[in-house]
């Protein structure tokens, strides 16, 4: 709709060299081409988390449940660049359970409380829960049924306190990078 048009126009106005969120179409295109750019903070945080915990990505089957422009789509590119075999599931995907059961890494980012159940996950999988859902009782839960799924995983992120802090950390990292680049450019201009 019209709101999407305005959103696209607004994103184009952000200088891609200062786009710390990684949403400008230039950065989105550069990410798709495997070029150096700012990456959307949540996918960037997920990759950093996997790397920090030395969770193998290369050659692994990774499934992303969700195809948003903020998480799902950029994460596809990030995982592909690390040589994962990437499958994307969404609201029209048939037999999601069959796909998730065969996945080494599962990223749940669809906005449905406790969607991913224990019977949908193979033993030893890594599960990243991006969801933030407020229940009627006020409790915040993710897209993963943590109680069930955590019994089968080798690694799982909690909600709250898992991906959210990593997103903020990557935003701060991008801000420092822009600031440093800006300062370096001005230092060289003076001489």
Kindly give the residue locations of the regions a language model identified.
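Glycine-rich phosphate/diphosphate-binding loop of Rossmann-like nucleotide-binding domains
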Residues: 40-115
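Rossmann-like adenosine-cofactor binding region
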Residues: 90-177
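Conserved adenylation A10 loop of the ANL superfamily
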Residues: 181
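Cationic, low-complexity basic patches in intrinsically disordered or flexible, solvent-exposed regions
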Residues: 191
